[in-house]
Amino acid sequence: MIEFIEIIKSIIFGVVEGITEWLPVSSTGHLILLDEFLKLNTARDLGAAFAEEYMSMFEVVIQLGAILAVVVMFFGKLNPFAPSKSAAEKRATWSLWFKVCVASVPAAFIGIVGDKLLEKATGKDIDGWIYNAVTVAAALIVYGVLFIIIEKWQKNKGGAVESVDAISYKQAIFIGCFQTLSIVPGTSRSGSTILGARMLGVSRPAAAEFSFFLGIPAMVGASLIKGYGFFDYVSESGVSVPVLAWVVLAVASVVAFAVSMVAIKFLMDFVKKHSFAPFGVYRIILGALVLIYFIPKMV
């Protein structure tokens, strides 16, 4: 019975990840909140330290399911070896990949080098300093307001850049710098990159699409780092990870993949007719609710 309940919980986590990873509303923020109300007990019998390590890994690694959805849905566009593509189309695909790689450098530097330097200097990594409810709420609200402001500012302007292929390397780097902001929980990786793109006048569909592609190296890299860290912890502690813990992780990842397919299709259809402002309103409301719920518990 306990195993069944944990699997049901993992399905819920997968659904939330699949929806919120691609909508600009912060998947990490939602998973933090979900863990507050619906804790996975899969690893808690092995102690608080192990449970914390497991959940930290779980919340990142299930993103692999979500990112696989992007690869599947945009495989034709992302595959430079497709025999049906002309030489010019193949060059355009390689150019897109180079832009994605270049745009990923700032976030990779901050996420790996900056995190290590901070931990060495203070004894705590970035998560240790900013991973809390107040930070999540503040980020939700601040970026919600920014979405509304930028969408209003761009309302009467045509998209200067109508496709991802038209994004320049300079613009790609600018958008990549915005991705570094997502290191703050509650910001939203997709939200920060979409904001950066919209500030440059990139059309909504192109901004969303480029954000999806930027997620591939970012999320694969983060998952590998977290996964390695977890296995290193398990190796040093000598803890035997229960089979249920792996089953729960696998189920959540598969569900995240399936739900992501729907969420991506929804967002691409939505932004062809509407602005990102409704997501800004949602973020502000959610941020306020987080403050109302958590502040009394912290006093």
What are these regions (language model features)?
Residues M1-V299:
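Multi-pass membrane proteins that catalyze or facilitate reactions on polyprenyl-/lipid-phosphate substrates
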